[in-house]
From Swiss-Prot:
Identification of the protein by name: Nucleoside diphosphate kinase
Family named by the database record: Belongs to the NDK family.
GO biological process terms on file: CTP biosynthetic process; GTP biosynthetic process; UTP biosynthetic process
Catalytic residue positions: H115 (pros-phosphohistidine intermediate)
Length: 147
């Protein structure tokens, strides 16, 4: 079963969107196997966004992601990376398809409410950055036979 990392960013947390976003994910049949509200420090932010070091927007990105709490999650399901990315929508909310999380809740590319791993490799790396193995749970959902 595939796993991915998804994070409600500070703008989503501060606007009270955690519940709505998690509800959308669970209604799709995706299993939430870990979740926690955390404050990211600069060191963790730099590790998470290491591929952007040196880019013009890097400092703004670090400043934003450390500006308030985030809700970090591990999701599990068949093709969960692709499904979660589709549910999030394009990075620019103005280009995101109607019904996606970013189209519904985000207003700016730099404040786009949610982050999700873009590949199995990044999912593994991000999950290991934000979660200890004992924090990721395995359980059966009653709806598993239906989705």
């Amino acid at each position: 079963m595939e796993q991915t990392y998804v994070m409600v960013k500070p703008d989503g947390v501060e606007r009270g969107l955690i519940g709505e976003i998690v509800a959308k994910i669970e209604k799709k049949g995706i299993k939430l196997v870990a979740g926690k509200l955390i404050q990211i420090d600069r060191k963790l932010a730099e590790q998470h966004y290491a591929e952007h070091i040196g880019k013009p927007f890097f400092e703004d990105l670090i400043g934003f992601i450390t500006s308030g709490p985030v809700f970090a999650m591990v999701l599990e399901g068949d093709d969960v990376i692709k499904i979660a990315r589709r549910m999030m929508g394009k990075t620019n909310p103005l280009e995101a398809d109607a019904g996606t999380i970013r189209a519904e809740y985000a207003v700016h590319t730099n404040r786009n409410v949610i982050h999700g791993s873009d590949s199995p490799e990044s999912a593994k790396r991000e999950i290991q950055l934000f979660f200890e193995p004992h924090e990721i749970l395995s359980y059966e959902k009653a709806v598993d036979i239906w989705v």
